[in-house]
């Protein structure tokens, strides 16, 4: 029996993975961005051990989530599942748009502040292969709202979070750090035109959460059906990884543990 935290678990992959892990007798904590969403998900996954509430576009609330999770105890597995795909620029703390905040900065803050788990799973996307790899203006502070386009920004953010995951993997000894492309399915993010099966992605979540794989693997990219995928080669470049880490540290003032 494992203790598991899944961020962004009120719908989609996060919710379905939580349901299956609860059915498999694990102690699962959910996360919702608001109290209203928390009350709703309690009825969708009644076997969950609890629901933590935090808006991951806020540094203060992301810190609070880490503090409340740490108060529960060390987790066996943490799935950093929360993410944004579509939407307006919407400035958040430090002037960062909501999308790169939720997709990159929030996972960075949580990686820094949460007690180190046995397994840490970042949610990537095959769309990281469509990203710009020059890492200029990661958080849109120079380009601003006039140049913002949500789909390219999403692709870039998933490239950035994979670089972050690989940087964390090098630092967190004793933790299997992985990233996963869940698949293109008809969730809130995927939309109605999606072609993959949710179950194929969820079974990968469940495998990684339970540790039903070689946990000496770290810095590895998984895809649906429990398979290891081929990421963009640039995701393995240490200079790019450290550029993302430094950008996150410069914005937040929070240092990633060595």
UniProtKB/Swiss-Prot annotation:
Record note on disruption phenotype? Accumulates 2-(2-aminopropanamido)benzoic acid, 2-(2-(2-carboxyacetamido)propanamido)benzoic acid and 2-(2-((4-amino-1-carboxy-4-oxobutyl)amino)propanamido)benzoic acid, but downstream compounds are still produced in low amount.
InterPro entries named in the record: NAD(P)-bd_dom_sf, SDR_fam
Domain of life, per the record? Eukaryota
Its EC number(s): 1.1.1.-
Is the NADP keyword given for this protein? yes
Looking at the keywords, is Oxidoreductase present? yes
Tell me the Pfam families matching this sequence.
Answer: adh_short
Residue ranges annotated as coiled coil are none
Q: Name one GO molecular function term.
A: oxidoreductase activity
Q: What class of enzyme is it?
A: oxidoreductase
Query: Where does this protein hold NADP(+)?
Result: 37, 55, 81, 154, 158, 185, 187
Q: Which UniProt keywords apply?
A: NADP, Oxidoreductase
Question: Catalytic center at which residues?
Answer: 154 (proton donor), 158 (lowers pka of active site tyr)
This molecule's function is given as:
Short-chain dehydrogenase; part of the gene cluster that mediates the biosynthesis of the yellow pigment chrysogine. the NRPS chyA mediates the condensation of anthranilic acid and alanine into the intermediate 2-(2-aminopropanamido)benzoic acid. The remainder of the pathway is highly branched yielding at least 13 chrysogine-related compounds.
Q: Which family does it belong to?
A: Belongs to the short-chain dehydrogenases/reductases (SDR) family.
Q: What is this protein called?
A: Short-chain dehydrogenase chyC
